[in-house]
Amino acid sequence: MYPLVHYYVNKQVFGEVSHLTALGALWPDLAVGAGGDRDEAHTRGVDFFNWCSANMPDALDAARGMIGHGIDPPCVDYYADEYWPDHIRGYMFREALPYLAQVAACTGLDGDTAISLLPPGGEPPRSNVWWKAHNLIEMSYEMITASIDPQIGTQLLESVADAKAVAILSQAIHRWLGLDAGAITDIYSAVPVSYALVDAGALAQAKVQAASMHHRFSNYNVDIPALAALLEKISCDQAEKYPIFMDLLVERTREQLKPYM
């Protein structure tokens, strides 16, 4: 999931989200840009918590944010990306299925556009279109979250702007994993331009996706207005489902975090 959803879940779980918790919740999706490993960042939150307990207790809030983002123990991204009871991947991938042809048309990405509901087990099909479509479902959740809580993007950016908190987390991850602390600091400084946070509307989200596809796929064929229109449609389609899934994320994440509170 994208940053606003993680922050929103943390607000429901913690009440008040510390800057370090917010920064820790961003880390799993930033790790690659700082020389880390995405899968490791999504599965080693508890390891980081234990390391912080022994070596750097002032970074424990960041570890809590990292745990809540990840897939082991099963928290937000586990249900969004990895597991849903009737499907081979998580809920966001399931919800993306009706939009594959439209995503292919407005992004120029290739891949199977006829993927159907697949039971758990086996190997998920590889498809750039399906992956991007699941990103758009996630972005629609950013849009809905911002409409419910208009100040949430500003609150998140206050955490990113907290140089002391960023320095604490950068040093902790540097000492834990050996990654360059400067690279970690730099990747956090890029957050305001890497995501649509204050203006989380469809056009802003579409522009972020276009920039991502330029970088990741050298794809300059994105139809930004068409992508924005598709995001608006998806957001409307997801509006009634949003509170049900978000309540589940909050409930499951709160339960998994109890041993670390």
Locations of regions flagged by a protein language model:
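N-terminal leader/auxiliary helical segments
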Residues: 1-67, 71-261
